UniProtKB/Swiss-Prot annotation:
The lineage of its organism: Eukaryota, Metazoa, Chordata, Craniata, Vertebrata. This is Acyl-coenzyme A thioesterase THEM4. It is a peripheral membrane protein. GO terms for biological process: apoptotic process; fatty acid metabolic process. PANTHER family: ACYL-COENZYME A THIOESTERASE THEM4. It is found in: Cell membrane; Cell projection, Ruffle membrane; Cytoplasm; Mitochondrion.
Length: 222
């Protein structure tokens, strides 16, 4: 092989060079464009796929928001964590992982409420059929995603921008698809740039503990 290459070089024939510019390589997918003149959709409000249990919990926390105890957090498909005063991104081809489906009810159906006094972020979560892991149950990775999203939102609302440094999940009881669970997270302590949080996932009626977790976040600004 080496002798053959040497002969080609000796005769002035150049071997083809592999293109190293990654930007010139064709993509394996095409991202559709979602340009719209309409106001961005808030996914954190009820739609027709929400079950009675999810609606009941939503209404319960909305009642708490009237007294100022809880505050509903808007949810958009192009913003990781909504911050008041910062308009949601529009005309963006990328989508937030938990809001990347066009059909309601088949993936991540959830809404979040924040309690500033208790440093708690609660997420009401109804997993759809596209999140299946073991037959009939929610994939563990999807559960971890929602824990990361909920604890991260709580850290952001208390401390500003953060990044996940560590996530430890203890799965205790599987979560059936279509059921409603409460993801209850709390910022436990802050040490310098480190934000320590805890989290539990319980059934809608608090009768079963599905998951426990801890997460460590690092504040982006000192």
């Amino acid at each position: 092989m080496l002798r053959s290459c040497a002969r080609l070089i000796y005769k002035g024939i150049t071997l083809p060079r592999q293109q190293q510019n990654l930007h010139s390589l064709p993509c394996s997918y095409t991202a559709p464009k979602f340009y719209s003149q309409e106001a961005p959709r808030d996914y954190g409000v009820p739609n027709t796929t929400w079950s009675k249990n999810l609606l009941d919990l939503y209404n319960k926390y909305m009642e708490g928001s009237k007294s100022g105890t809880w505050k509903r957090i808007p949810s958009y498909n192009a913003t990781v964590h909504y911050i008041k005063g910062v308009p949601p991104v529009r005309n963006r081809e990328k989508r937030l992982f938990t809001r990347n489906l066009d059909q309601d009810g088949v993936g991540f159906e959830y809404c979040m409420f924040y309690n500033k006094a208790e440093r708690r972020m609660v997420c009401l979560f109804q997993p759809g059929p596209y999140l299946e892991g073991p037959p009939g149950f929610t994939h563990g990775g999807c559960i971890a995603t929602m824990i990361d999203s909920t604890t991260g939102a709580g850290a952001v609302y208390l401390c500003g921008g953060v990044m996940t440094a560590n996530l430890t999940v203890d799965y205790k009881n599987p979560i059936p698809l279509g059921c409603v669970v409460i993801i209850d997270s709390k910022v436990e302590k802050i040490e310098g740039r480190k934000v320590f949080t805890s989290c539990q996932i319980r059934s809608h009626d608090d009768s079963m503990l599905h998951t426990e977790a801890t997460a460590l976040f690092i504040k982006l600004c000192p």
